[in-house]
């Protein structure tokens, strides 16, 4: 088996690696082909190519304040009076997810928000501390992704360790709250739930044995 592996694949030298064209591809953001498909459909709707970036930023800015989940309803105006912003967002959703799309522009949004001193509108309701309020958006990880679009001059500043921790913690809390709404308990009685949200009996106060 070992000999077969060595025959099929061998460790390349630095010189061999240098001959390869390796681009950054990440499933956190849309692929080039997905972005091209979005642009093509926007053009079919009548949007001018010169306005593509402005409208992408408009979508990402809305989601910065309102979230980019599957259930969010994008509102606002595009640069065209004939095309509402939700219609452009609908095209995005045909080829990718809104969150992946927004991640691609996260660095641009981050810089703009810092420059204008505009944290996400719902930072307080999400229980962020004031010091970490600029991290209170759900595509925050795009700010640190090398696959995201980099603004001229780079980031105004990198996210702080506390901001990263606050966002990750809030993400886990949100996932837990979402899962708890789908609890698999057959009753809502507090005798069973102990007053706690849970998707399994152990977290609700019952012993739970994972199936073999």
Swiss-Prot record:
<dbReference type="GO" id="GO:0005198">
    <property type="term" value="F:structural molecule activity"/>
</dbReference>
<comment type="similarity">
    <text>Belongs to the potexvirus capsid protein family.</text>
</comment>
<keyword id="KW-1139">Helical capsid protein</keyword>
<dbReference type="GO" id="GO:0019029">
    <property type="term" value="C:helical viral capsid"/>
</dbReference>
<keyword id="KW-0946">Virion</keyword>
<keyword id="KW-0687">Ribonucleoprotein</keyword>
<comment type="function">
    <text>Required for genome encapsidation. Forms ribonucleoprotein complexes along with TGB1 helicase and viral RNA.</text>
</comment>
<dbReference type="GO" id="GO:1990904">
    <property type="term" value="C:ribonucleoprotein complex"/>
</dbReference>
<protein>
    <recommendedName>
        <fullName>Coat protein</fullName>
    </recommendedName>
</protein>
<dbReference type="InterPro" id="IPR000052">
    <property type="entry name" value="Pltvir_coat"/>
</dbReference>
<dbReference type="Pfam" id="PF00286">
    <property type="entry name" value="Flexi_CP"/>
</dbReference>
<keyword id="KW-0167">Capsid protein</keyword>
